[in-house]
Amino acid sequence: MAHVTIYTRPFCGYCSRAISLLNEKGAEYTEIEAGFDPALRQEMMRRSGRNTFPQIFVGETHIGGCDEMVALERDGKLDELLAA
């Protein structure tokens, strides 16, 4: 199973939803809490080109935020991506 990296911030409903979906899938992930750390937030923005939370990477592939991950699940593509 591919390793997931998720950049989050505290008290973020989208972050919580994304983590819940990853847990449902049994995905291995590293959570990087970047909300109050300027260096980590800068790293997230450099990697993703976005400044909103969460930002999710499967391996080195940026899939976007929670809405994009939910769309992949709805379209039946998330399992395949996580299995790679």
How would you describe each model-predicted region?
Residues 48-58, 67:
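Structural micro-motif
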Residues 13, 39, 64:
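Short alpha-helical
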Residues 61-83:
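Non-catalytic, surface beta->alpha helical segment in thiol-disulfide oxidoreductase systems
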